[in-house]
């Protein structure tokens, strides 16, 4: 299993849900499902934060290698530390900014699973050229609220090449964790909280 860093650059409050395997469980399960069908060699993580998905993708032998982009220097350091701690540093390439150029030049951009979580930057990142270049990869985009562009407009960008499945965050249950039965309701709720201000939505893009 993956060893988590004691000091987390991003989402310190998410540590309990990560330990229990509940953090963004919808996405963990989806990546597993995609790989069962396709067995892509490369995982591309755009907005890697502290490396939970990037490092986990190769620790669990789901992918041969990972390319992770994180704009924050502290974040890149956290990913590197986590990769070293988990003995997978040679399988992970850590880069700073993801843009149309840096992504389109990647060898496996069209043969990978792409996970994107960049706090609203997704609307600018996914240009017509990038969408063409990444086909027929699978992509998972975390959708953030943005008043400058409608979701319908954003969806239209992909429709020629990709089918879109919308995934909505599901309620978490701790009933299977006997070690938490003596925790009060408030503490149990905090353990599974991901601190979101609204119910999260992700889009899974699969090639037509």
Regions found by a protein language model. Name each.
Residues 60, 85, 130-134, 157:
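Glycine-rich, phosphate-binding/catalytic loops in enzymes
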Residues 1-73, 77-82, 86-91, 104-109, ...:
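S-adenosyl-L-methionine
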Residues 148-153, 175-179:
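Short, flexible/disordered intra-domain loops and linkers
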